[in-house]
């Protein structure tokens, strides 16, 4: 279930933009962040885009699983890990800095699948 109300229109992430999916927050297991639109533009390659994302913690958890989920339509049930994309999840308790590749979607969000201990979850998504 997302943490945030649906907003119309959604925030969009263009190349070079930084979006805060979680900003020093305490999401529980199963909580999703606000969603962001990934606009299409002329000349966009068919092999998908790359999305850089970074995870950090104020206090490191003992165990964690965070996913970068995408969807074609902005419907909670459609958000999932995309087939064929790489670097879409992290279990590193010290934080992570990844580049998700092969992403073909219109919307993106972060989801805390599980977390034990720790505090101050921050997830940056870079367009």
Label each PLM-derived region with a short phrase.
Residues 1-19, 122-127:
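Short, intrinsically disordered N-terminal pre-domain segments
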Residues 18-46, 57-67, 84-98, 115-120:
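Surface-exposed ligand/attachment interfaces on beta-rich extracellular proteins
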Residues 48-55, 101-121:
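Noncatalytic modules at the cell exterior or secretory-pathway interfaces
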Residues 61-80, 123-126:
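Short, surface-exposed beta-strand/strand-loop-strand elements in extracellular ectodomains
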């Amino acid at each position: 279930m997302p943490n945030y109300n649906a907003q119309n229109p959604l925030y969009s992430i263009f190349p070079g933009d930084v979006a805060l999916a979680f900003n020093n927050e305490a999401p529980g297991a199963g909580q999703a962040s606000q969603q962001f639109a990934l606009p299409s533009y002329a000349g966009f390659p068919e092999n998908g885009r790359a999305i850089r994302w970074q995870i950090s913690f104020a206090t490191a958890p003992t165990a964690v699983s965070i996913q970068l989920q995408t969807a074609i339509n902005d419907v909670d049930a459609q958000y999932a890990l995309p087939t064929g994309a790489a670097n879409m999840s992290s279990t590193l308790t010290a934080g992570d800095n990844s580049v998700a590749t092969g992403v073909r979607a219109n919307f993106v969000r972060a989801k805390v699948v599980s977390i034990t201990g720790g505090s101050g979850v921050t997830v940056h998504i870079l367009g």
